[in-house]
């Protein structure tokens, strides 16, 4: 396991009904292929040794003997392999014939897990041939040349790296209370399911939803393998489904209705799952109730089974799963996500306006992304409350660095949205203030810049008093993380609608609104604002009036910072893992040295600027990451970042 990842595979082998030799050969080929890719655990379909559709042939002793002999051959085949294989087999325990999953490693049967829920409806008649795990008493049997305990107890397997996995067989996942509920609450992090799921119209979508929900509810990974082409089509068809889920997200799947064998591999982030569980108090509380079954009384005891340590040299780790370079962006449902985020912001502001009986909002509009989004939210909130847009006082405050482009866009946007407007140049007041404190007014230092930000905030606050209104904050989540705001300047407001919206998402939201509006002049201004370089415009523009001070030159690309922010806050990853993931996500766009530089900068700025976040104004949470000191993020302002920076230096 590297960086908290474990590589797993779900296989759909070629199968012939009751031909155990052919089936074993197909299984071995896929095991070798998976081992070559560094897979640590591979799962096969239900009854992959015999074929699922043997029906009454399961009563034939020859088939049972052939199956056991095939298992002996598989044990011999895996003797020198580190990979853990989970295969489906019929197993006799006294008078009972059980539908089982065998866990095999290094030529040994690590464990045998019998199926609990046997479907006996519609096209399924499993109770005709098999007994349930609930019919079984713990029994040691001699099988495939080894002595193995077969038990109804919850079996939890542990790899040499401490990863815990459990097993369900097909119908188990469809039960009202699946075995995976108790297994995951007992510590299992990956569930493997050996299945033989028939195809029906609509069933595939339902199955995906079922697996996603179970994975999400149990904060686990779910690896599913169902038999495909080669099973009998006498009355049903097996389409060959294979999925890998991680906390509700599908990270890999097989091609449906393929005639060929398939091997689906991916890496599961065990560290992320563990972080989720530690953070989720509901999951922790549910673990306290796991020993009592509300239907049948006390649940069976759990049994821990240790897998064997690695014999061979560890292969070089390669990550095959795709890492989204913009984790805050849901590319598959972007329009719906933007509308949802926008409405959360609108509803938050609407509630604050109703509560305060406020019918006047004061907002500074610069022609940049953040103030544009805040203004759009404000307009939608006023419309929703059926308030006159004249109650929105949009103020543009040109300064030393204001460019013609941003000024023009700000003025056009305010005019076309039909809000009340005011223009106040901050230059005279800032010059006077700088002279009052002994500044030469020509040195472009932090005093020069911050004086402008605080002057703008003072104007907005005073106007709010004058008009009996509230100041709407415009700063975003990314700026708060980096401390890229002036303390008691743009840092302060009476309600901050963008406080949990990262910069990369702000851009998408403004783009979304530009595509939805029917006012072409508004759309044109919004599109140009999206294309404008991000800048606080606190130092003079160049000779042509163009932006000279570009934020990303100082703090790094926002797409990198938002990537760092997401994994640092959402999952608590250490810098080395964030660096590794960033190199995967931005391969070909940023060099490793550049990523390291900006990661170091991000961590340092994040720690140093906590004092600004400790006194944030109220604002709505829109996603899973927030820096509100009253909600998601509580951190001492004087915390030391030495260890984090030291790890980055060693990369």
What label would you give each PLM region?
Residues 1-362, 380-389, 416:
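Enzyme catalytic cores with a strong preference for nitrogen-chemistry domains
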Residues 6-7, 161, 220, 229-232, ...:
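ATP/NTP-dependent adenylation/nucleotidyl-transfer catalytic domains that generate, transfer
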């Amino acid at each position: 396991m590297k960086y908290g990842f474990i590589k797993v595979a779900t296989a759909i082998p070629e199968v012939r009904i009751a031909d155990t030799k052919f089936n074993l050969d197909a299984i071995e080929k896929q095991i070798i292929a998976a081992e070559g890719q560094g897979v640590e655990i591979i799962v096969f379909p239900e009854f992959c040794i015999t074929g699922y559709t043997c029906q009454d042939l399961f009563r034939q002793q020859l088939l049972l003997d052939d199956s056991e002999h095939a298992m002996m051959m598989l044990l011999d085949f895996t003797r020198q392999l580190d990979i853990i294989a989970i295969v489906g087999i019929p197993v006799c325990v006294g008078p009972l014939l059980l539908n089982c999953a065998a866990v095999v490693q290094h030529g040994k049967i690590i464990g045998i897990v019998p199926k609990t829920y046997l479907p006996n409806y519609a096209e399924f008649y499993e109770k005709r041939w098999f007994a349930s795990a609930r019919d079984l008493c713990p029994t040691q049997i001699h099988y495939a040349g080894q002595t193995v305990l077969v038990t109804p107890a919850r079996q939890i397997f542990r790899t040499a790296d401490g990863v815990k996995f459990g097993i369900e067989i097909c119908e188990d996942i469809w039960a009202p209370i699946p075995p995976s509920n108790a297994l995951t609450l007992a510590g299992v992090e990956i569930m493997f399911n050996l299945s033989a799921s028939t195809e029906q119209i609509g069933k595939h979508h339902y199955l995906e939803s079922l697996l996603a929900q179970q994975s999400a509810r149990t904060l686990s990974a779910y690896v599913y393998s169902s038999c495909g082409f080669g099973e009998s089509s006498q009355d049903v068809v097996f389409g060959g489904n294979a999925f890998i889920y991680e906390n509700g997200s599908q990270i890999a799947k097989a091609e449906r209705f393929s005639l060929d064998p398939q091997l689906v591999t991916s890496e599961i982030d065990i560290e992320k799952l563990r972080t989720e569980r530690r953070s989720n108090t509901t999951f922790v509380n549910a673990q306290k109730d796991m020993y009592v079954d509300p239907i049948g009384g006390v649940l069976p005891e759990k049994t821990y089974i240790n897998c064997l340590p690695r014999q061979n040299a560890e292969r070089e780790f390669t990550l095959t799963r795709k890492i989204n370079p913009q984790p805050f962006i849901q590319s598959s449902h972007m329009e719906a996500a933007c509308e949802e985020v926008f409405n959360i912001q609108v509803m938050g502001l609407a509630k604050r306006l109703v509560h305060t009986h406020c019918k006047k909002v004061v907002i500074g509009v610069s022609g940049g992304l953040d103030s544009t989004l805040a203004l759009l939210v404000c307009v939608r909130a006023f419309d929703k409350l059926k308030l006159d847009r004249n109650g929105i006082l949009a103020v543009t405050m040109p300064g030393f660095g204001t460019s013609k482009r941003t000024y023009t866009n700000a003025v056009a946007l305010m005019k076309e949205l039909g809000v009340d407007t005011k223009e106040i140049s901050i230059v005279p007041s800032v010059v006077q203030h700088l002279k009052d404190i002994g500044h030469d007014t020509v040195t472009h230092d932090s005093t020069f810049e911050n004086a402008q930000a605080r002057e703008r905030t003072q104007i907005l606050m005073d106007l709010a008093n004058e008009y009996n209104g509230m100041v709407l904050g415009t700063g975003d989540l990314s700026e708060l993380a980096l401390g890229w705001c002036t303390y008691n300047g743009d840092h302060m407001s009476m309600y901050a609608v963008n406080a949990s919206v990262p910069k990369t998402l702000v851009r998408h939201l403004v783009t979304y609104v530009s595509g939805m509006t029917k006012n072409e002049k508004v759309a044109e201004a919004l599109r140009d604002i999206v294309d404008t370089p991000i800048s606080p415009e606190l130092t003079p523009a160049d000779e042509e009036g163009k932006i000279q001070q570009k934020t990303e030159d100082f703090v790094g690309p926002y797409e990198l910072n938002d990537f760092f922010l997401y994994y640092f806050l959402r999952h608590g990853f250490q810098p080395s893992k964030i660096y590794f993931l960033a190199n995967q996500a931005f391969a070909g766009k940023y060099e490793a040295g550049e990523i390291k530089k900006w990661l170091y900068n991000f961590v340092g700025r994040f720690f140093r600027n906590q004092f600004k976040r400790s006194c944030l104004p109220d604002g709505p949470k829109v996603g899973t990451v927030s820096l509100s000191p009253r909600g998601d993020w509580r951190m001492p302002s004087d915390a030391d970042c030495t260890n984090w920076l030291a790890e980055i230096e060693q990369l």
